[in-house]
Regions:
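Pyridoxal 5′-phosphate
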Residues: 1-401
Length: 401
């Protein structure tokens, strides 16, 4: 079990003095993850699965070990894990890989990241698929009763984020997944903001597919991610890419492809990144996923104190139990980008501002953007307190109703 101090000591980026509250965008990389990647470059920097020399054998072994480490985090088997460069790629594998018929329906929510909306919009144009969005409550929650009105027998796929990246609300994915199954639909979970932050069990969720990046909750490197496919669902998907590394044999006009999951990983992959992601999965397990979730709840509860500041409006539910480690807000009379810039300039506090790649969610709130603060296990109470103090000063000096 790693303490907060242990983890902070492991993250070189924090030694710059930054108060980093932009974890929903990307997280800093711990030194053990960097070391695993450097070890690849320094000791066995070879391609995988292409050759018999010892360097390529070791590279292949370490690459494949990462599959099992990822699987352990979400209670899957290694054979159900496809390596991707991010969650976006995983979602697009579903969009381009399933067999669609005119009139099929995809159900998402109004709160989705653009990566879980735009691929379905393309299917509307190219395949005659219909996209329906489940409405949210004023607090940006998706109620099962609202989902029940949208999901029907015409629904081929339900695609829902576990935690809203823009607002931080935790959605009832188990209940939504049951609605999908009851109507004969497939169920895809965008777990970009939950894996590594809280327990995620694909067996309990009952999903057919799950997409996640490596560079957020898992503390892994950018350009990595994974796609979980329930073992009996591989036959329903075509690979997104075809090429080297996924064939058993090739004739002039035909080829025989390898079995999943490798058939979905054409071309030379991000070998050091995936090895780093495997080490990152070990790292968050060493901390303890429950321990991470508990600490993030505590820090989020502290961040929610900003709702008491005059001129500050916080979006989403007051109940921290319905939130991940994300708090989205605005200061009346001050543009969201200006607030983020002032937090940076005054106190080296890093937050995100804008529509957070969730423009429909912003329209639901009636704003063009928000300021978003987001935590991880390593953040300190003192850092959150500093953020609150500086925000209060900004609101006092520049805010208005």
């Amino acid at each position: 079990m790693k303490s907060v101090a242990d983890v902070r000591d492991d993250i070189p980026f924090l030694k710059t003095g930054i108060i980093y509250l932009d974890n929903a965008s990307t997280t800093p990389t711990p030194q053990p993850v960097l070391n695993a990647m450097l070890e690849y470059f320094n000791e066995y920097s070879a391609n995988i699965g292409r050759g018999l020399h010892r360097a390529t054998r070791r590279a292949t072994e370490m690459f494949e070990l990462a599959r099992g480490k990822i699987a352990r985090v979400i209670n899957a088997t290694p054979e159900e894990i496809i390596f991707t460069k991010n969650a976006t790629e995983a979602i697009n594998i579903v969009a381009r890989g399933l067999k669609w018929r005119k009139g099929d329906k995809v159900v998402a929510t109004v709160l989705e990241h653009h990566s879980n909306i735009i691929p379905w919009q393309r299917l509307e144009r190219t395949d005659g698929v219909k996209l329906d969005l489940i409405p949210a409550t004023p607090d940006c929650l998706i109620e099962p009763s609202a989902a029940e009105k949208i999901i029907d027998k015409k629904t081929h796929l339900v695609a829902v984020s576990h935690v809203s990246n823009a607002i931080g609300t935790i959605q009832p994915i188990v209940e939504i997944g049951k609605l999908a199954r009851d109507n004969g639909a497939l169920f895809l979970v965008d777990a970009a903001q939950s894996v590594g932050h809280m327990p995620v069990d694909v067996k309990r969720i009952g999903c057919d597919f799950l997409a996640a990046p490596g560079h957020k909750g898992l503390l892994g490197p950018q350009g990595t991610g994974f796609f979980y496919v329930r073992g009996d669902r591989f036959d329903e998907l075509e690979p997104l890419l075809l090429g080297g590394g996924i064939v058993e044999s090739v004739e002039e006009h035909s080829c025989k492809l390898v079995a999943p999951p490798q058939v979905f990983e054409a071309g030379t992959p991000n070998i050091p990144g995936i090895i780093g992601l495997g080490r990152a999965c070990e790292y968050v397990i060493e901390i303890g996923i429950e321990k991470i979730a508990e600490r993030e709840r505590k820090l989020t509860e502290q961040m929610m104190e900003i709702s008491k500041i005059e001129h500050v409006r916080v979006y989403g539910p007051k109940d921290v139990g319905r939130r991940g480690g994300v708090v989205s807000f605005n200061v009346g009379g001050v543009e969201h980008h200006q607030v983020a810039a002032m937090l940076d300039e005054i106190a080296n506090v890093a937050v995100r501002s804008g529509h957070h790649c969730a423009a429909p969610a912003m329209r639901h709130l009636g704003v063009d953007g928000t300021v978003r603060a987001s935590v991880h296990y390593y953040n300190l109470e003192e850092e959150v307190a500093k953020f609150i103090d500086v925000l209060e000063q900004i609101a006092q000096d520049f805010g208005r109703d």
